[in-house]
Swiss-Prot record:
GO terms for cellular component: outer membrane-bounded periplasmic space. It comes from Shigella boydii serotype 18 (strain CDC 3083-94 / BS512). This is Glucans biosynthesis protein D. Belongs to the OpgD/OpgG family. The gene is mdoD. Pfam families: MdoG.
Amino acid sequence: MDRRRFIKGSMAMAAVCGTSGIASLFSQAAFAADSDIADGQTQRFDFSILQSMAHDLAQTAWRGAPRPLPDTLATMTPQAYNSIQYDAEKSLWHNVENRQLDAQFFHMGMGFRRRVRMFSVDPATHLAREIHFRPELFKYNDAGVDTKQLEGQSDLGFAGFRVFKAPELARRDVVSFLGASYFRAVDDTYQYGLSARGLAIDTYTDSKEEFPDFTAFWFDTVKPGATTFTVYALLDSASITGAYKFTIHCEKSQVIMDVENHLYARKDIKQLGIAPMTSMFSCGTNERRMCDTIHPQIHDSDRLSMWRGNGEWICRPLNNPQKLQFNAYTDNNPKGFGLLQLDRDFSHYQDIMGWYNKRPSLWLEPRNKWGKGTIGLMEIPTTGETLDNIVCFWQPEKAVKAGDEFAFQYRLYWSAQPPVHCPLARVMATRTGMGGFPEGWAPGEHYPEKWARRFAVDFVGGDLKAAAPKGIEPVITLSSGEAKQIEILYIEPIDGYRIQFDWYPTSDSTDPVDMRMYLRCQGDAISETWLYQYFPPASDKRQYVDDRVMS
């Protein structure tokens, strides 16, 4: 949790780590890509070479934690770190004619201690040359860095990189890779939100979570006028190595990433998380416990959406539980899943610092057969917006043993809306509150005599209006308790229907209640499936307290 909190805070500041065992794997050649800042010796490079590097690296022992940074970097505050700026005149593709993209590097420092090596590649000749660290690549401003401590440290490396797109070259980045294997992108709002990672290991097991690192990147030199670039990455950790290829399309309204990886297990792994996503949910329309602020909602994402291999669409609203929760949803060759931020109305957030209404959704589309496995969702209790408390990933069914090799291909869409939608009625919003009284009498002259919790789920789209005269039937399944006072209400402002029911406990258990609902008309499903997890209070809290003073 400490690592996740650090990455969250550090990336937020950066938005306004030494490589083990790869040096001996490089071969040297003759000439490299056209980049003024690339100063290393030339070496042959392509994706097959990177796969061989990762394969061979997995046969060697992991060399452990990164070496200490110079004191002037290790003791930096976030404010000081954020004041270091890369010199835009020395950007990676500064000399490319009619460039639409450009790349800059993040400085080492603060908690970013893992050395990341950078290489420029000429895609025509497949020759690469390393870009070594040197202080003149940066403007230190008032960061207070003693640059004398950095002299001669060409092997210091970088912390990560970010990419800019015209007309905002050197001003507003659209892609960022920084910290462990974390990376992010934006849509046309230029507002960062949730993150992705290269890999997750033992996120929810009895072992300590492992955070693999991207330890080196190779950049194909972009073509003049191009808005697509390709970057390759070497991933390394105690348990696994990997070769990654990212083909990143920086479009007008979204960023699309085609990802291909080849993974090589060093040792047995209890839980391997493929294509992990990391987000934040503090409070929303369904979960008000932590919303005692001026903001009605605080979240990077509001739901997990899943398009299962059998064609079923599922909407799972996110929670901020009082106790850590992990749920695994079984599937076979999923068609897609993602953490979505579909509510884009500023008035629902009232936040001029976080701008949560502008944050992108992230949708994943497998590009090869993933087989059997589960979509894992972990929800961590949080008191606020500074901790990423939502983690989602694909876990293959097959246990991972030392020496195993895997290959996954997938596409990531960073956009306001996912590229595909359920053709049936979709969940627009989930709300919860006091139950046990007739709608329109909230709660009347006195509190209800019997405690209950009300759930209201709004559905829009599909064939709802055509189905209404024939009869819409909510199909509700509960793991415990009873659903009563079920109502179907037409909501004119959204041109949709609200399904409302009260949940009544049938025991004193405080175990999470799994709820499932979809809409049916004449035997056919006419909506996506709504999944929810409710956490009932202790039995002595299931009462309404009238604290009014009438005299």
